Regions:
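Short, surface-exposed acidic
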Residues: 31-47, 75-91, 172
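Glycine-centered loop/turn motif at secondary-structure junctions
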Residues: 31-35, 78, 116-117, 137, ...
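Alpha-helical elements of Rossmann-like donor-binding domains used by nucleotide-donor carbohydrate transfer enzymes
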Residues: 22-29, 47, 68-72, 105-108, ...
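Asp-based, Mg2+/Mn2+-dependent phosphohydrolase catalytic module
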Residues: 1-7, 126-219
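A metal-dependent, Asp-based hydrolase signature
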Residues: 50-90
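Substrate-recognition element of Asp-dependent hydrolases with the DxDx(T/V) motif
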Residues: 83-102, 106-134
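Active-site neighborhood of HAD-like aspartate-dependent phosphohydrolases
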Residues: 1-47, 190-191
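Soluble or luminal CAZymes and related metallo-dependent hydrolases
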Residues: 62-69, 98-105, 156
């Protein structure tokens, strides 16, 4: 019998408004996209996963991460930006939530599910996730929220799952895990979690895991 429902944040509770997590609405306002190709930007950003993987437990530490992240991204693109723009981009990512949209039915889904499961959030994310969850009145649904930067790890390392599993003493067959990323579900399955792949937008053609389109599946 399932006792726990472990959820990812991105594409399960929330989505990015611009199509990419790090290209925020403010990014599109401040950066001349006629001079930069989006694919080139994303390719440049992919070089700095080490920066994004730094341990951060405060918003100030997160700000430093994203200041360095954007600075290095523009350096590799040979695109000149002012100090003010770098600061504004880092502030925007860390201290605002307008970059995210939340699925319309998420409150009703969680309100029902909290009476059936122990709800846990497991997210590759940064300290900004906590105030965002609070401001959107979502934290109250979760028994605990695990943010990867607090532990200096991420789901792809596997040990992030171990932290949660050990703290709750979760036995095989006791927990569902929902994520939109097939490779992360592979890792979760190795940890004896019963996995489902979320596809709220209906874009996944096939997967080795069972595909769901909302959290009503778990009612």
């Amino acid at each position: 019998m399932k006792k726990y429902l472990i959820l990812d944040f991105g594409k399960v509770l929330a989505y990015h408004k611009t199509g990419d997590w790090f290209i925020t609405p403010l990014f599109l306002e401040l950066i001349d996209m006629d001079k930069l190709n989006r694919e080139d930007i994303l390719k440049a950003m992919s070089n700095f996963s080490d920066i994004l993987s730094r341990k951060a437990t405060t918003l100030e530490e997160e700000y430093s991460i994203f200041y360095d992240f954007y600075k290095n991204t523009f350096n590799i693109l040979n695109y000149s930006v002012s100090e003010e723009i770098l600061e504004n981009l880092a502030i925007d990512f860390t201290y605002t939530d307008h970059k995210y949209g939340f699925y319309d039915d998420i409150y009703n889904e969680l309100d029902i599910l909290k009476n059936k499961y122990i709800l846990i959030l497991l997210s590759d994310n940064w300290p900004c996730c906590n105030p965002i969850m609070d401001e959107r009145n979502l934290s109250k649904y979760f028994d605990k929220i695990y943010i990867s930067s607090f532990y200096g790890t991420k789901k792809s390392n596997g040990d992030f799952f171990d932290i949660l599993i050990n703290e709750y003493n979760i036995k095989p067959g006791e927990a569902y895990f929902v994520d939109d990323n097939e490779s992360l579900l592979d890792i979760a399955k190795e940890k004896n979690l019963d996995v489902r792949q979320m596809d709220r937008e209906g874009v996944v053609v096939s997967s080795k895991h069972e595909i769901i389109h909302d959290l009503k599946y778990f009612y």
